[in-house]
Every structure is written in C-alpha cells, then in structure tokens.
Amino acid sequence: MSTVAYPRICPFCESACGLKVEVDPGSAQIIKISGDPDHPLSRGFVCPKSQGLRSLRDDPDRLRKPLLREGTEFREIEWDEALERAAAGFKSVIERHTPSSIGLYTGNPQAHIAPLQMAVAGLLGAMPALYANSGSIDCYPRFLVDVYLYGNLGHVPVPDIDRTDFFLAFGANPLVSNGSMFGASNLPQRIRKLQARGGKLIVVDPRRTETARVADEHFAIRPGSDALLALAMIDTIFSEGLANCGRLTASVSGLDDLRTAAANYDADRVAPLVGVSADRIRQLAREFSSASRAVAYCRVGANCQTFGSLAVWAIDCLNIITANLDEIGGAMFPAGVLPQFMNAPYIDGQPPHGRWRTRVSKTPELGGTVPTTALWEEIETAGKGQIRGLLVICGNPVLSNPNAERVAAALDDLEFMVAIDIYLNETTRHADLILPPMDHLKRTDFTMIWNNWMVEDTVCYSPATFPRDPGDLDDWEIVMGLGARLSGTDPARFERQSAEAYLASCRPGLPRFPEDMTVSEALDLASGDSMPERIYDVILRTGREGEAFGAYPEGLSLQRLQQTPSGINFGPMRPGRMPAAIDTPDRRLAVAPPLLLADLDRLETAIADGFYGDNHFMLIGRRHLRSNNSWMHNLQNLAKGPARCTALMNPADAERIGIVSGDSIRVRSRVGAIVVSAELSDEVGVGVISIPHGFSRELPGSKLNLAHRLGGANVNILHDDMAADGPSRGAAFNATPVDVEPVGTRHAKGDQRRGQAQ
C-alpha cells in the first residue's frame, strides 16, 4: 500500500506537538498517527490523545450538517438556511429586548483553532454580547495576578524546566496535562533530564499524581491550602534573611507589606491547616531559596479553588523574592515571534479589570470577559438587559461549569440559542440550531496562542490532510457568515473588515510592521489561500523575526514556514525582559496588591469556620492522559479500558463508612448530589475524595452513544458556583466540602461523622 504522511499540529492540548498523519490516498483513511521526529519542539514525542484524530474523523455521532430544532427533535438543513435562521433569531431577540440581551460562551477548543480566535473578535463587532469563556473556569486567578503583579493580563510566567535545578509544582500534573500554560512537549523526558543533572522535582498536591510518583518529594497537603503553604514559605524566607530580589530589587514595590502579610502565616500556625510539619515547611523554603536556579509553578489544582488568586500570587512571589523571576532556570516570560495575543496592559492607570461590571451581581470584567457564573445569573434574572439569546461555540458548559444543574436550567430559560459544535451533547441539546464545523484534518492549522507560553519559541503551520467535501464549512466561515448576516454586510466585505480590525489590534505587538503601511495594504500584499492564511502571513512578516515585506530577505513569512513543514524553532526563552516589560503604572512589580491583601480576611474567616477541619470530605478533581475535559469520551480508541469516572477514596475512610472498592456512594454538596462508584487508593489522604470531570449519564436529546454507554457522573453537579475565587470570581473545582454515604451496599455500617448525609 502506498501512503502519504502529512505533518500536523496536534490540536488537543497546549503542547501543540508535531504529528505525522499517514494516509491511504485511495481510501482517504488514516493508517497511522505518530510523532514527528523533525518537529523542533516535540521531537517525535506523542501522547495517546493524538490518536483521537482518527476516531474524531470517523465518529458516527459527529454532526456533518446543521441541525434545526423542531419540537423535541432535530432535522438536518442546508447551510444558507441555517445561517439565515441563526441571524434572524438573534435579531429578533434584540428587537424584542435590547442590544445587550445576547450572551456568548466559548469553550476550550477555541484556543486551539487559530481562525476561530480571530473570527470571534469580528463577530463581537457585529453582535455585541456579554462574553464568558472557559478561561474563567481554569485561568482567571492566573490572569488576575498577572494584571496586578506584572501589569498585563498576558504576562504569564513560564517555568524554565530545561535549565532549572529546583522545580516546585503546586497543583499541577504535567506528566498528564503535558504542561498547562507551560508549552513543553515530552515532559517525562524533560523531568528525567532535570533529575539526571542533579536537580529536584517537588510536587505539592493532595493526590499522589502521576507527576508526584516520579518526584523527589511529594507534599500531600490538604485541598485548598496552597496559599497557606506558600505564605508560610514566604514568611520563613523573610524571617531568616533569605529574601533577595536580585537585579530586579529596584523594580519591586510592596516588599514590606508582603513581609507583614506573610508574618501572620508562620510555619507553626500553618502546619496543622496544611497537613505538613512546620520543620518541613521551613526546610522547603530554605531549599528553594538556596537553589542556584529554582522555579515555583502552579496550575489547575492551585488555581481552581476558592483561594486561587491568593495561591497564584503567593507562589509567584516566591519566585520574585528569591531572584528567580525573569532569570534562566526560573519563571520566565516568552517573547515569541508572534505577538502576545492576550496583551492587556494598564491604560491611563486603569487595569484591564473592573472597567465595567455586570448587571446583576456587579461582577467586574477581566480582560473584557466575565466569569461564567455571571452569565448564568444574567440569563436567570429578569429586567432590562436580561440575556435572552445565547451563542455557544465549542463548549459544553453543562459538563464543565460548577453547579451544572443550574447551568442546564438557565439554558432552558433562553428564548433562542445557537451552538457551533460537532456533537449533540449535554449542552447543545438545549439549542435551537447546531452548526457543525468540518473535520479538523480538512483545514490548515497554525500555532498561535500557545506560542506565548512555550519554553522554546516554536512556530508551525500544517496544510490540510484531506480535501473538503461539498457543503463543508470551517469555524471561520461559519462565524464570518453569521456576522455578515447580523450586520447586513456583504460576506466578503465583512470578512475583510474583520481581518483588518484584527490586524490593527495586533499591530502594536508587531515590531517590523512598516510605519508607512496600512493594515489594508499589508493584507493586499499578503499571500495565502484564505483570509486567515493572509492574516498569518502579515503577522509572520511583521513580527520579531519577519521579513517585513522585503526589508529582511531572510526573515519569516508564511511561505517560508510552509517550506519548513515541521516548523521552526527560534530557541529557548530569553532572560532580561523585565523591568522593561513591566506594565504597572509605576513600572514596578507590585508584590502586595491591595485587592489580594484584602482577600486575606476571607482566608482568615475560612480558617475560623473550620474550612480546613476534618468534619467533611474535601473533593478534588483529576486528569487522565487519554482524555481532555469532555472532548474525548465518545472516541473509541481513547475511551476504552477500565472505568475512569470513579471516586478515589482512602481505604481508612472506606472502612469508616463501610464500603469496599466498586460500591456505589452518594456524594453530596451544598448544591447537588451524585452517585458514583468508589475506588479505594492511598493516592489520596484521609478526608480527600477525587472525581474527574467531563463525564455524564445520558440526558434526553443528547447523542453520544459511546460516552453514555460507558457512563459516569457529572461531578460539576457538586461543585459550588458560589464558592468561586474571591478576587477573580474564577470557578472552584478543588476543595469542595462534601459528605459521603454508602448506597444500597451490604457492607454499609451506617452513617459516620465524616461522610454523614445532610
């Protein structure tokens, strides 16, 4: 058999690894998916998720034509009718109510689809909407700290794992996540190299995760206590005279206030709350501060909790006060060949936070978006400006948002809903129209947002693997078609206007954009078979390494990138971006932002109220290597194997409430209850229960046959939307207090104190 191998960017996580997709041209079937050995970042590494491209293409449940709701059923319609109906529906909502009656929700895949990122900006110009996205679920505390500490929502510090000697990871499982907000493909090998050169990996996590198993030391803290541990370390560093901001000393403000705040969380006080001895906390602080090159990093476990902003802030401060910020081996700020697409600095003294507030709860915006919890209450609450129409793009908030039953009820309350999605799932079943984009392998691909978080400055372009079929539309075309109809503009003109507006917003971050050239002129000169490709070309030509329309003949362009099918690597992160890149009003790193210091009062209240006590279970999540949120549970080659939607419990807790592995338990929180199978393991400590998210039982109207046959429970029925992080209002998926009881098991000994049903 003669096959053809196509280079491809894996679209399933932030590492954006390089793949080789081997195809039989005659049958148009995928024969093999493997790692691309020539990819300059992943270098042949591949994880199981990559194999999902085959199942995703062949999935019989995948939608291939638009669906229109008729009563409780859906029927297929053609694209022109679908887009006309979608635009007419939103216009009708606006006419009956107000222009502020539309909401927009975008899910995680948006960040993996470069044209969709650009298209959403154009759509918001045609249909202003209250915008919530999945960033408020897993990133808001990170972004808020970036704003107040560094002055820019886009300044995300990335651990320099390849050159560090001491990697301290809070609430992160990079062996499974492949690195989150930390683009470092093949992390197993990078960690082995760290340890081979004499470095240490320390993991702070309530569960003995896959990463914790290979760590030099694992601190099994109580869920939700990351901020307490980091503050105790800060106090030790200050009190023992170990603090040193290095070359950035003159560019740091608030050190005295930080020292005073941390002094209230000395190791002796914090130890019983965290579950780590005071001596070990102090020793960890000494080891971290004395390492020649150290970095503290945190992700979802520390970020997605009720004290997420405090945790991220305190962990970042560890890097600053030990001279490990913006230094080789520390926390660094990539300056990629592409512009910082999340660039949002202070403007005239105003941070990109709180410039306006929502109607109902007066929740402050962050970077122009609002927390998803604010979106649901805007749908529920009557009055002028109530959200009555909603567009959901590649998201499944019924499975991914806290208090999931409230989310589903809010969707039922809408007058009109459109979903751009490839499945009839737990969320899209509520829609009036479902608009499915074509197979990912039929479109070109380009790394964009992830370049801003990569440990090596890598840029890649992938040609389409398969030809399009008649009637196929990609995400860009769907959104542009909807926007044109909403604005009453010729589609080609709307596309051009959207492209020009997008490039104008990028221009400040394009150092080689000719001063005497307009964005319209640049687009006219650009190459590419589609408008998104022409945008890529302009960005590449005018970025840091660009050829600037002939001024630098050896520079970068789309054509040059296409001639290097595995991508181009411009080297590792470079130190020295600070202090020039600090965007706070006084151009100093603000280690004691008043907003975060004020949130310590809420932490004190939680301590006093027994939040860290032992009178309830603490629920945490967990990742699986063969899954990503709810994306992959309907893909045969990834969903096979043992059941994954189980509740990990410590054997001592199981004995106390009278269950064994495989028994059903009822887990109950303030907002809901689910029944799930127990799996006993000493991976979690006493009082901790771990359930993954993205699973669901079959709901009326949804069509995910494999996922529903495998079953599972929606853990987000348990997570409390009112327990959100205080300063950012980001969602809390870890350290949710719950009670546990047996369900119909002969092993039950009756209710126990921990786990008693309420």
Set out the residue ranges of the language-model regions:
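Glycine/threonine-rich phosphate-binding loop and adjacent beta-strand/alpha-helix elements that clamp
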Residues: 441-468, 478, 483, 487-488
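Active-site phosphate/pyrophosphate-binding segments
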Residues: 233, 251-372
